[in-house]
Amino acid sequence: DCGYDPVTKELYARDNVGAAPPEQVNDAGWIRWRANDLNRFLKRLSQRLKAIDWRVLITNAPVQFPFSYVNFAQEYPAWVREGSVDFISPQIYWSTSAQYERELGLQMSRLEDVTRL
């Protein structure tokens, strides 16, 4: 249910001919709009930080994809692909090493460049 604050609702209306955000939090268009907005923000932030000091490393520890996308609009494969982050460290928590290795493999399959994981 992230994104229903007044500022985000105003930004959504601006981008959508005055329309209010969908009431259904799982609306595909709403999730896509929020993810695009977050992707643009992270790209701008990354560029500004790198302009100040190119040596700074931009990292993030999102929850697993696609859960991160559906629930928090965190599309971390796009962040890696677009160069908005230098590397990511997905939050993967399992009680057995087999479960962990399986989930890590799934997360790696989401990335074109696994060296940034």
Please identify what each model-predicted range represents.
Residues 82, 97-117:
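Surface-exposed substrate-engagement region within the catalytic domains
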Residues 55-59, 86-89, 116-117:
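Structural preference for beta-strand elements that scaffold enzyme active sites
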Residues 91-97:
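Catalytic beta/alpha-barrel core
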Residues 1-82, 94:
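Polysaccharide-binding and catalytic clefts of secreted carbohydrate-active enzymes
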